[in-house]
Every structure is written in structure tokens, then in C-alpha cells.
């Protein structure tokens, strides 16, 4: 298992221009790749390192199959660009101009980055926070577009690719079983999916720009002046900005922690708050507003949590050969595809 010592951290401090001693450190996040493969040399470790003066920095250690030094460097440069343009982000340190560099530590080769530790992490999302986050995302998009900034990396929220919100593939992989339950309904769903996808494809060839890629409560903080900021550019990459805006909005409206008074139906208030905030900073075009219902229906119909992860998911119903439950899911998917709400601005 990858391990670090205070001496390792002090060496990093020196390289990155932090001329203090390390008073201690704690792990914030660790991926245990060795559990699946004892010989794995893949690493993702994030630590909080405290200095003898009482300040703290976050050090990220990475060695993953899909991560390159160029990618991490570009992600760091994007965070710096945002900060230079008024977006609240933690200070990113550099070692002689390098925001990311390779280290050999305890027998592992890892990419290292260093940034200030920030407090005030947001634990839940209310309508005010959602509106402010929408504004923040729009301003970030404006900076990225204005500066023609790019990061070559896959993102979580692109509707025309594998993504973390919905998956038609998780439906279609069960084609034969679904057809055995109700062939006509299966074909209706496939045709409906094609119709929605064709509408959403309108923006497929739009220019793509760098996005942070994972606006959420666990990656947001509020500074001492009440300004919302963003950290963690691990999922930063190029995306069509409209796709990023809508999918981030739905993500924020469905998958966060919310105050008790809205927790039972957060989307009804969080989604319009987020999109309205975004629209005030970066107005949606008529065409973007027109396409929204189809993208929303696509996300809802094949919502990944319902397709795969929920205890009562379609996948579980199929695994249990519960034909009645599967038929109910097929009917529900049809209903969701038919629900085409206007963009709630």
C-alpha cells in the first residue's frame, strides 16, 4: 500500500515553495486499489498537511491508468485561470512553474499537486446555494469560453457519451429479456430514445471548452465573506457548455443533501433556482431552452440510479426474473420519456 511520511511531505513543501515544517497530516481520501489487485501500483490519495505556523495545504498523490501529467497540469492551470478571473478557488502552488510533477515515494511513482486547504465546505444545498452555484458555473463557463481554454479529459456529464446520470446502455443490454416481457413496449422505448437523442444531438458539434466537471456540495465551499468557491478539478475536461449546465443542474437537484423542509421533493425548487442563477449570468438561447425538455426526459427515463443502483432497479428486477416489476419499469420509462417540461426559469 502506498504510504507517505512527514519527511516526504517536507520535501514536497520545499519543492513547492512552502518553507515551513510539517506539523502533521491526515488522510482526506484514499482509493484502495490494492484490495482488487495486491500488486497494483495505482494510487489516489489526498491528504491535509498542517504547517508549524497553523496553516494547511491539500496534497494530492495520483497514479491512475487514465491520468497523465499533462492532464493534471492542464486541470491545475484551469483552476489558476479561474482564480485570475475572479472565481473563488484555493491557491494552487507550483514548483519552478510546474503545477504538477512526478515523485518516487515508497516504491510508487506518483503525480503530486499542492493547494491551500479551505474550510467552509458546503454540506447541503438550499435554494439560495443552488442559485449561487448556477451563477458560479455560468461565470466559470464564460471564463473558459472567453479564454478558449481546453483540457483533454473525459467528463462525467456528456449526454452523448457514457455518463454518471443516465444510461440507455443499461437498459438495452437486457434486450432479449425485455422483449420477452413486452416486445412492443421495448421497441417503443427504443424509438422514443432515438427521438430524444436526435433532439439533444443538435449541440453535438458545438465548440467544447474546459469545465470543472463536478459541481456539487462536496466540491463547494463558502469563504469568510460568504462567496461560494469550488475545488477539486479531478473531473475537469472539455464539454459542450450547455450539456454541462443542464446535467450539473439536474445532478444538483437530485443527488445532494438538502434541508428537511425541501428534502422530500428537492428538484421542484433546486432545479429552477440553479438554472435561473445560471441564466442570469449566461442567458440560455431560445434553441437551448427549446431542447431542454428532451434532454431532461432522456436523463429521467434512463436515470442510472433506477437502471442499476437502486434496490428496486430495473437490473435487480431482471436479475430476479420479476417480469411484473420489469413491465412496470418499462411503462415508467415510457411515461418519463413522454414528460417534456419547459426549462424552469
Regions found by a protein language model. Give the residues of each.
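ATP/Mg2+ or Mg2+-diphosphate-binding catalytic cores
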Residues: 302-345
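Active-site activation/catalytic loop segments of kinase-like enzymes and analogous catalytic loops
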Residues: 242-282, 297-314
Amino acid at each position: 500500500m502506498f504510504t507517505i511520511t512527514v519527511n516526504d511531505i517536507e520535501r514536497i513543501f520545499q519543492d513547492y515553495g512552502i518553507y515551513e515544517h510539517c506539523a502533521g497530516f491526515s488522510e482526506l481520501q484514499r482509493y484502495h486499489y490494492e484490495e482488487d489487485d495486491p500488486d497494483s501500483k495505482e494510487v489516489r490519495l489526498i491528504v491535509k498537511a498542517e504547517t508549524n505556523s497553523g496553516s494547511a495545504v491539500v496534497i494530492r498523490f495520483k497514479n491512475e491508468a487514465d491520468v497523465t501529467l499533462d492532464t493534471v497540469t492542464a486541470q491545475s492551470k484551469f483552476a489558476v485561470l479561474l482564480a485570475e478571473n475572479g472565481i473563488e478557488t484555493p491557491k494552487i502552488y507550483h514548483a519552478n512553474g510546474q503545477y504538477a510533477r512526478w515523485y518516487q515515494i515508497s516504491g510508487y511513482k506518483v503525480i503530486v499537486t499542492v493547494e491551500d486547504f479551505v474550510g467552509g465546505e458546503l454540506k447541503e444545498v438550499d435554494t439560495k446555494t443552488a442559485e449561487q452555484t448556477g451563477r458560479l458555473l455560468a461565470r466559470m463557463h464564460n471564463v473558459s469560453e472567453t479564454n478558449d481554454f481546453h483540457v483533454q479529459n473525459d467528463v462525467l456529464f456528456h449526454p452523448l457519451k457514457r455518463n454518471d446520470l443516465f444510461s440507455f446502455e443499461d437498459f438495452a443490454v437486457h434486450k432479449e429479456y425485455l422483449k420477452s416481457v413486452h416486445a412492443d413496449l421495448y421497441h417503443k422505448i427504443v424509438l422514443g430514445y432515438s427521438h430524444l437523442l436526435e433532439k439533444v444531438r443538435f449541440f453535438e458539434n458545438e465548440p467544447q471548452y474546459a469545465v470543472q466537471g463536478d459541481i456539487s456540495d462536496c466540491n463547494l465551499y463558502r469563504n469568510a465573506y460568504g462567496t461560494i468557491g469550488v475545488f477539486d478539478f479531478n473531473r475537469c475536461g472539455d464539454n459542450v457548455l450547455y450539456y454541462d449546465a443542464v446535467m450539473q443542474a439536474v445532478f444538483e437537484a437530485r443527488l445532494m443533501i438538502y434541508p428537511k423542509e425541501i428534502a422530500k421533493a428537492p428538484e421542484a425548487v433546486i432545479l429552477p433556482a440553479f438554472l435561473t442563477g445560471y441564466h442570469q449570468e449566461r442567458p440560455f438561447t431560445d434553441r437551448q431552452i427549446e431542447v431542454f425538455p428532451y434532454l431532461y426526459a432522456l436523463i429521467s427515463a434512463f436515470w442510472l440510479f433506477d437502471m442499476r443502483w437502486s434496490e428496486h432497479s430495473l437490473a435487480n428486477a431482471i436479475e430476479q426474473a420479476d417480469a411484473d416489476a420489469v413491465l412496470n419499469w418499462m411503462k415508467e420509462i415510457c411515461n418519463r420519456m413522454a414528460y417534456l417540461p419547459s426549462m424552469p426559469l
